[in-house]
Amino acid sequence: MASMAGPDHLFNLRNHFYLGAYQAAINNSEIPNLSQEDIVERDCLVHRAYIALGSYQLVISEIDEAAATPLQAVKLLAMYLSSPENKESTISSLREWLADPTVGNNAIIRLIAGTIFMHEEDYNEALKHTHSGGTMDLHALNVQIFIKMHRSDFAEKQLRVMQQIDEDHTLTQLASAWLNLAVGGSKIQEAYLIFQDFSEKYPMTSLILNGKAVCCMHMGNFEEAETLLLEALNKDAKDPETLANLVVCSLHVGKSSSRYLNQLKLSHPEHVLVKRAASAEDNFERALQSFA
């Protein structure tokens, strides 16, 4: 992270990235007078934005062997996401780096490790590399991992650490919204207000729209959720969270969800909703065969 002593030249770039304005992050990345450390962080953010947009091959081809270690880690994430059939070798390379005392403690490498192992649903392994924190990105990832482990008590402790560092930080606000959604009940309204605040301060993104829509669904406002999700779909027709949320929302408003599910199958075959749907189909087929 940039030193608090001087101006934070990457503040706007980070904010674009955190809120899902990935193209804006890329378009506004030419920033003058950056230190060498800031240049590496800037390049990592830009390439992570390309990864978020699904441009894996661009990242793989642009980052060569001479690039800084954090950028090599970002390239590894692109390789992991681009070819699931080769993920074992990618994870093996990652483990080698993590075991190397000269680079293994680098914040970006630990962030990428946490992200990959979270994808693998190996949450304990993810936490092994992220739990010590050190950056707001790592603390926020810890919150996500604990929520996936259904340990909102640990997630709350991480959130308190973030609040002590910077209560107004975009990642602190996002982590608070994620936790409120996980806890549910009266906390849903608090999560909605966070996303509403984002939508008033910043250009609307799929991430903000999905956040508001999920809150609406939790509160039973499925028509409003559908409107928000269709707006998100107009911004990015392949966004997996938008498609997954539209599948759920369509079922609640009595509309067919098959088109959205088929789009999700084509663009993100590894998505948890696609796997659950396939499992349900298999179980249904087996049930039918038992009656045949």
From Swiss-Prot:
Say if the entry is tagged with keyword Transport: yes
How does the record say this protein sits in the membrane?
A: Peripheral membrane protein
Gene Ontology MF term list:
structural molecule activity
Q: Which Gene3D superfamilies did the record assign?
A: Tetratricopeptide repeat domain (1.25.40.10)
Instruction: Give compartment(s).
Output: Cytoplasm; Golgi apparatus membrane; Cytoplasmic vesicle, COPI-coated vesicle membrane
Q: Which InterPro entries match?
A: Coatomer_esu, TPR-like_helical_dom_sf
Q: What does this protein do?
A: The coatomer is a cytosolic protein complex that binds to dilysine motifs and reversibly associates with Golgi non-clathrin-coated vesicles, which further mediate biosynthetic protein transport from the ER, via the Golgi up to the trans Golgi network. The coatomer complex is required for budding from Golgi membranes, and is essential for the retrograde Golgi-to-ER transport of dilysine-tagged proteins.
Similarity field: Belongs to the COPE family.
Q: Which proteins does it associate with, and in what oligomeric form?
A: Oligomeric complex that consists of at least the alpha, beta, beta', gamma, delta, epsilon and zeta subunits.
> Which residue stretches, if any, does this entry annotate as coiled coil?
none
From the UniProt record, give one GO term of the biological process aspect. Answer: protein transport
Swiss-Prot/TrEMBL keywords: Cytoplasm, Cytoplasmic vesicle, ER-Golgi transport, Golgi apparatus, Membrane, Protein transport, Transport
One Pfam family name is Coatomer_E
- This one is known as Coatomer subunit epsilon-1
Looking at the keywords, is Transport present?
yes
Q: Which GO terms describe its cellular component?
A: COPI-coated vesicle membrane; Golgi membrane; plant-type vacuole
Q: Which SUPFAM superfamilies match?
A: TPR-like
